[in-house]
UniProtKB/Swiss-Prot annotation:
Record's keyword annotation contains Transcription regulation: yes
Keyword vocabulary terms for this entry: DNA-binding, Nucleus, Transcription, Transcription regulation
Biological source species: Oryza sativa subsp. japonica
Main location: nucleus
Gene3D superfamilies the UniProt entry points to: DNA-binding pseudobarrel domain
Protein name per Swiss-Prot or TrEMBL: Putative B3 domain-containing protein Os10g0158600
A GO term for molecular function: DNA binding
Location(s), subcellular: Nucleus
Amino acid sequence: MSSVVFASARLNATNQSYLPVPITLATAYEMQHGDSLRLKTSHGLKIKIRIKEAASTLYMTTGWKEFAEATGLETGETILFRMSSRSKARVMLLNRQCLIRCPVKTPSTTSSDKNRSLSPSDQLTRASTSAHPSTSKSIPPLRNGTGSTKRSIADTSFCHQLKLTAEN
C-alpha cells in the first residue's frame, strides 16, 4: 500500500504490556502474526515491536512495554500512528487532555517512585529543586554562567529542542 494510514489507541490499565493493533492499520497493511513494526517518535526514539495473534486479534507484544516505559506513557493517554509502510510507524503522544506531549521517560530514584509517573510540571519542579540545593524560591542560574535568572519558555520546556515541520 502506498498511501499513509492514520490510527489511534488509548492506553488503559490492561494494555500496558501489550496493545491491540488498531483495526485500521491491521487491515490496510494486511498485518499478521509474526510481523515486526518499528515505532519512531519525532525525538529519534526507535523501538521494534512484534505482532502476535491471539483469539483472532493482533497485538503489539514484544517491545511494546519497552516503548511505553521509554516514552512515559500513562493510562488514559493516546498514541497516534502514522504508517506509510507495513513495517514502520511514526507515532505522536497525546496526554489525557489530548495535547501533544514529548515522550519523556520519568526518572525514578526509589523503589516507591518506580510505580508512579510524574507530570511534566512535577518533573520540572523536581529537576529545578535537585539542581539547586538552596531552600529559597530563587531560580538557579542558567547553564551558560551568566548568572541571569530570566527564563524563556524554551528554557523550561522539555520539548525545547523539538522542531515542528509539515510533512507532505
